[in-house]
Amino acid sequence: VVAADALLQTGLSPEALLRCASEGERGPKRDTHPDNIAPALHGGIVMVRPEEPEIVIPLPVPTGLAVALVHPDLELETSEMRGILPDVLPLKQAVRQWGDCAALVVGLYEEDWDLITRALVDRAAEPHRSPFIPGFDAVRAAGLEAGALGAGLSGSGPSMFALCRSVSEAESVATAMAGAFAEVGLEGSDTHVSEVGDTGAHVIEAPA
């Protein structure tokens, strides 16, 4: 949508671009949540309130924060992974998850690595999706042992992510996690490492 907006010179606002991009992610139930689109457009880390229109709230990125992403040689259908999630979350479990979310926001603002580590817990989706990832627990453990702040399932999977204090640490973590996947027969995982930047999708100038 950013490229189309630039090509057509429509001058759409960030909010309008978000709505257009979100339409492309609508599922069979005609529902959508811009949890992927918003950070791609805005960059960095954002929080999204699912209102009409959605409210996108940028959050601070601690200095040096990097991410390692490991994609094993495995295919999972996003629609199926969405379908296995329960419609209702037990109150006790929900309360703990709300607390984790709040702690993560505070950790980002204060650059508190320890608090970020303790807050990186998915109590809602991961318990239901992780059984479909061979070696999930071992892969996460390998990432943590290599120094990651936290690790878990990326979206619907099968990719797994890890947040790290630096790019060099993230490279070591990615290697360790890919190795753990190989030990359960999923060799040749794709790995990607990047600092968490604050620049979203934008038009770049072609080299002269």
Per-segment meaning from a language model:
Residues 1-7:
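Stable alpha-helical structural segments in soluble proteins, enriched in small hydrophobic residues
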Residues 5, 145-148:
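Long, contiguous secondary-structure blocks with strong helical propensity
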Residues 10:
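Phosphate-binding glycine-rich loop
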Residues 13-146, 165-208:
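ATP-dependent small-molecule kinase catalytic core of the GHMP/sugar-kinase superfamily
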Residues 36, 155-157:
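Short, conserved active-site loops that position catalytic residues or coordinate cofactors/metal ions
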Residues 150-154, 193:
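Short beta-strand
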Residues 157-164:
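Short beta-strand->loop micro-motif that forms the acidic, two-metal-ion catalytic signature
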